């Protein structure tokens, strides 16, 4: 388990001190894939580098496996870091070494015997799908394969935690998907805790169990990925989700809806469904029960952690009393009802 307590990080800049992280508190259970997302400059990379103390925090504690890394001696910290692997956006492979030898490098530096190195590296190359490329050099393999080498190298010391700092941001969408599938498989098969830093909500949606949203060095939202998508509270979260699932009407549609609302009454709603709710005729039943009119303005269906997720923007009109009853009924069916505006 990883526990970050009251963590702050300050750097001295040309115009004074800069607070990169402010009073961050996070708990990441063993075996979880935990995402940390935010825009550029939010403090994501600074935060992930405090987990293995590549960056020592100005204040606070970092517990990994029950040990406070900030209180360890230099020798103890080197030992603790063997339990924490890390992969980066840039692959950092040695061009003069083969795929096998790049993965073997940390074991060689640790003084592991050659026979044990082979017994460790070959299964790792098989795990990441590079057994046939073990004798090739970095210049002879693709970007996605280079990242797989980086993953295998990070796993060579048999860590309990894997930190991923924007590991897919330089890859094309298809390769990104393959790397994320690999990380999820490693998580399942090895029981590895993965902390994944990204600015892409698509990555969070596809692979993470829980997510923390970082803005200006502060955690502004945290929760299960499906819950955060269903009920985003902070404006930064809404904006990030909007990169994947549209949360707002297109401008031209907004203008038409505004004109229409001026002539009558209505409720502009965002409805979010998940799981079996996507397959059920809930809107049809609501219309029949409460004699409402639903005009669907915008809709999208996606998948989060293997579960169907749907989002609709609708204009609802009807008798005021029945409208309130209809909203209550929808919520009873597990639908998230968010009123975007009301015009009378």
Swiss-Prot record:
InterPro entries: AAA+_ATPase, ABC_transporter-like_ATP-bd, ABC_transporter-like_CS, ACT-like_dom_sf, MetN_ABC, MetN_ABC_transporter-like, NIL_domain, P-loop_NTPase
Intrachain disulfide bonds: none
Domain of life: Bacteria
Membrane is among the record's keywords: yes
The protein, known as: Methionine import ATP-binding protein MetN 1
Pfam families: ABC_tran (PF00005), NIL (PF09383)
Compartments where found: Cell inner membrane
Protein task: Part of the ABC transporter complex MetNIQ involved in methionine import. Responsible for energy coupling to the transport system.
Main location: membrane
Topology of this chain in the membrane: Peripheral membrane protein
Reactions accelerated catalytically: L-methionine(out) + ATP + H2O = L-methionine(in) + ADP + phosphate + H(+); D-methionine(out) + ATP + H2O = D-methionine(in) + ADP + phosphate + H(+)
Domain ABC transporter: 2-241
Assembly behavior: The complex is composed of two ATP-binding proteins (MetN), two transmembrane proteins (MetI) and a solute-binding protein (MetQ).
GO terms for cellular component: plasma membrane
